[in-house]
UniProtKB/Swiss-Prot annotation:
Entry-linked InterPro entries: Glyco_hydro_17, Glyco_hydro_17_plant, Glycoside_hydrolase_SF
Pfam families the record matches: Glyco_hydro_17
Record lipid sites (GPI-anchor amidated serine): S359
Positions annotated as propeptide: 360-392
EC number: 3.2.1.39
Organism classification: Eukaryota, Viridiplantae, Streptophyta, Embryophyta, Tracheophyta
MF annotations from Gene Ontology: glucan endo-1,3-beta-D-glucosidase activity
Stated name of the protein: Glucan endo-1,3-beta-glucosidase 14
Length: 392
């Protein structure tokens, strides 16, 4: 009886493991881990959740030491953020970048896999000319500081931008930057090319649909079957808006002389709730958008103009953030509630432990526990099957 019970127990664990592995693959998908909330689980608990989901790429908006500490030896790749408020000082005083790296990155880099620093977020959208002028010098200061530490090959330097930098996005082959930004974007792109770092874009088809629901087919923005559109200049067919937006950015970059810079999606998502005028914000649409997007990522799909380059995406966001300012939608982009329950079904069922783990040793043990238990489950299943075969 005891043997039968254990066999059943491990079969259940094996089934759970196979189900989760089939539902979502970590490769190709990242998650934005925002923390503008007062009800989120501890970083140690989040580490267990992401491990159970097989998500191995995380983007932060800062360099929270508690998060980086909790993910020590976790095999999760981190993009850490350097906030807009640091840029002006770093642009004029490179030692500020050196100090920041020594305080925020160096204590963790030997244990936690930090692969990129995102210098500023949507700088051009601020219309703050001092801030815009500070972006490239600040990025250069950070890169120089990384070089001084011998980390320039291990950690890339980039920045995330809004699609507002484009003046034209339709058709994708005619994508172009706003004229007033070109004087800043040309040297910025030259720097990206020089250090071989990707250009990050925050792309939200939701906004296009919300603003023009009568002109933009819902199926086109939700990756559902639709007629799509054909670019008259290239004859390339687009069946979803996100890919069209990415290719429009590639076209804009090409107009400034670069075909050697990869575009990556640092944010995209769909809100599960919104204000009355935020048409399309619903759990049903959010589930369709993110669920279909995850399928495309797992298929390693490229855009029509870059078919050989699988899209690189960080989904926004891991949790609903109850303290974010702005419309209701801003607080409802999360895939999960703070208690670890899915906001809607996209085939992601993770495990968020109830206990708060605080020590590094305990956190590491918990992160490895999932792997150990699954290994035992597989081993027990094989042994059990072998016994049954011998009995026959």
């Amino acid at each position: 009886m005891a043997t039968h019970s254990l066999s059943f127990f491990f079969r259940v664990l094996l089934l759970l493991f196979l189900t989760l592995s089939e539902r979502i693959k970590g490769q190709g998908v990242g998650i934005n881990y925002g923390q503008i909330a007062n009800n989120l689980p501890s970083p140690a608990r989040v580490a267990v959740l992401l491990r159970s989901l097989n998500i191995t790429r995380v983007k932060l908006y800062d360099a929270d030491p508690n998060v980086l500490f909790s993910f020590s030896n976790s095999q999760v790749d981190f993009m850490i953020g350097l906030g807009n408020e640091y840029l002006q000082n770093m642009s004029t005083d490179p030692t500020k970048a050196q100090d920041w790296l020594q305080q925020r990155l160096e204590p963790h880099i030997s244990k936690t896999r930090i692969t990129s620093i995102v210098v500023g977020n949507e700088i051009f959208k601020t219309n703050d000319h001092v801030l815009i002028q500070s972006l490239l010098p600040a990025m250069k200061s950070v890169y120089a500081a990384l070089t001084n530490l011998g980390l320039e090959k291990q950690v890339t330097v980039t920045s995330a931008h809004s699609l507002d930098i484009l003046s034209t996005s339709y058709p994708p082959s005619s994508g172009s930057f706003k004229e007033e930004f070109i004087q800043y974007l040309q040297p910025l792109l030259d720097f990206h090319s020089q250090i071989e770092s990707p250009f990050l874009i925050n792309a939200y088809p939701f906004f296009a649909y919300k603003d023009s629901p009568k002109e933009v087919p819902l199926e086109y923005v939700l990756f559902q079957p639709n007629q799509g559109m054909v670019d008259p200049n290239t004859n390339l067919h687009y069946d979803n808006m996100l890919f069209a937006q990415v290719d429009a950015l590639y076209s804009a970059i090409k107009t400034l002389g670069h075909t050697d810079i990869e575009v990556r999606i640092s944010e995209t998502g769909w809100p599960s709730k919104g204000d009355e005028n935020e048409i399309g914000a619903s759990p049903e649409n959010a589930a369709l958008y993110n669920g279909n997007l995850l399928k495309l990522i797992q298929q390693r799909k490229g855009t029509p103009a870059k078919q050989s380059v699988p899209i690189d995406v960080y989904v926004f966001a891991l949790f609903n953030e109850n303290l974010k300012p702005g419309p209701v939608s801003e607080r409802n982009y999360g895939l999960f509630y703070p208690d670890g329950k899915p906001v809607y079904n996209v085939g992601m069922q993770g495990y968020l432990p109830d206990i708060i783990y605080t020590s590094r040793a305990t956190t590491i043990k918990i992160l490895n526990l999932w792997r150990v238990v699954m290994g035992l489950a597989v081993a027990w299943f094989i042994l059990d099957m072998g016994d049954k075969m011998r009995m026959r």
